[in-house]
């Protein structure tokens, strides 16, 4: 009986050591959860905002990074950029690049994007801007028109990419 209790205590101690806090090289933060088969960590470019969050900018799981949808918010002001669709689309792609960088990846490693447009009439403009950022071997992509986006954004993009280096 004592051996069983000791074994259970040992397993409890081992399992409680699975999560740990780490910082990325670029000053972003990451929270890791280690297991025998994969590593999962949250990614925030720069310091994470204070208070509770309902989503993370990105999650790294193994060798993949999954980003949340990025909209045209200027990270310095937390305001939507001015200048219409084109300005928002450029900011979205800059924000996406920053999140990928914090995760140890970059635009060249993107495998798949999902683009959400508030108005499908912006599709051709989006393609022109998108092409400037994904020059060679563009990723697989889906584009969907939606009724409304957060903060009345006109475009949102999420991505799945390979991690080039592990920032643990």
Residue positions per predicted region:
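Bacterial N-terminal signal peptides
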Residues: 7-15
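N-terminal presequence-like segments and the immediate start of the first folded domain
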Residues: 5, 17-94, 98-108, 117-168
């Amino acid at each position: 009986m004592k051996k069983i209790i000791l074994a259970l205590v040992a397993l409890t101690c081992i399992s409680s050591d699975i999560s740990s806090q780490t910082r990325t090289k670029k000053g972003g933060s990451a929270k890791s959860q280690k297991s025998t088969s994969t590593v999962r960590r949250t990614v925030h470019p720069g310091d994470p905002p204070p208070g509770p969050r309902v989503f993370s900018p990105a999650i790294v799981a193994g060798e993949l990074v999954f980003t949340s949808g990025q909209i045209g918010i200027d990270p310095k002001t937390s305001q939507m950029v001015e200048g219409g669709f084109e300005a928002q689309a450029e900011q979205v792609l800059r924000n996406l690049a920053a999140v990928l960088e914090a995760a140890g990846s970059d635009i060249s490693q993107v495998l798949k994007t999902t683009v959400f447009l508030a108005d499908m009439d912006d599709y051709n403009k989006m393609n022109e801007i998108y092409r400037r950022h994904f020059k060679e071997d563009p990723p697989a992509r889906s584009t969907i028109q939606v009724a409304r986006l957060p903060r009345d954004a006109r475009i949102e993009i999420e991505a799945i990419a390979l991690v080039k280096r592990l920032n643990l």
